[in-house]
A protein has these predicted regions:
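An N-terminal assembly and electron-transfer interface module characteristic of large anaerobic redox
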Residues: 1-173
Length: 173
């Protein structure tokens, strides 16, 4: 947009990590040439505290992930930073931006990744890998049989900014 039309813009994704959310707000207000509202600093501090409080609760917990409305690799980078261990990630694509988050995930663990979010064949992996949680789409019947707790983030399409961090932490904790 900037190069072609001279229009500045910010890619404001549904990030989970407080630092990335705060950076997006800073870029937005810089482009608008407006001061960053003070309440954003407070929300940022709240999100950092909420994330830190989640670490002892989530540390070591394993999960599978189906596709979500969130920025998938960023979400998993955030969750691994909290100490969670993804066993299998179902992700539809890998963009250039995702590469940094993929590398962050690999500093914590090396999960299986499948491009197809095909619940049919993947249902057989619940009793084998035994994840504590399934975040996003999945086979509810097989999860129940395997003792995997289903976590749905139904509000993901309706939130942005620090609300994403709040939703993620509340849904999983």
């Amino acid at each position: 947009m900037k190069r072609k039309f001279g229009t500045p813009y910010v890619v404001f994704e549904r990030y989970s990590d407080p630092n990335r959310i705060y950076q997006s707000y800073k870029e937005l207000f810089e482009i608008l040439e407006k001061p960053l509202p003070e309440k954003l600093v407070g929300w940022y501090q709240d999100a950092k505290e909420r994330s830190e409080a989640a670490k002892p609760i989530l540390g070591g917990k394993t999960y599978f992930s189906g596709n979500t409305a969130l920025c998938n690799y960023e979400l998993h980078s955030f969750l691994t930073g909290l100490g969670m261990k993804p066993l299998l990630l179902q992700i539809s694509d890998l963009t250039a931006q995702d590469e940094q988050w993929r590398k962050e995930i690999l500093t914590h663990c090396d999960p299986y990744v499948t491009r197809a979010a095909n619940i049919g064949p993947l249902q057989y992996l619940y009793p084998v890998l035994k994840p504590k949680f399934n975040i996003g789409a999945g086979n509810a019947k097989e999860m129940k049989t395997s003792g995997t707790q289903m976590i749905r983030m139904m509000q993901a399409y309706n939130v942005l900014g620090f609300e994403v961090n709040e939703m993620v932490c509340e849904c999983i904790c």
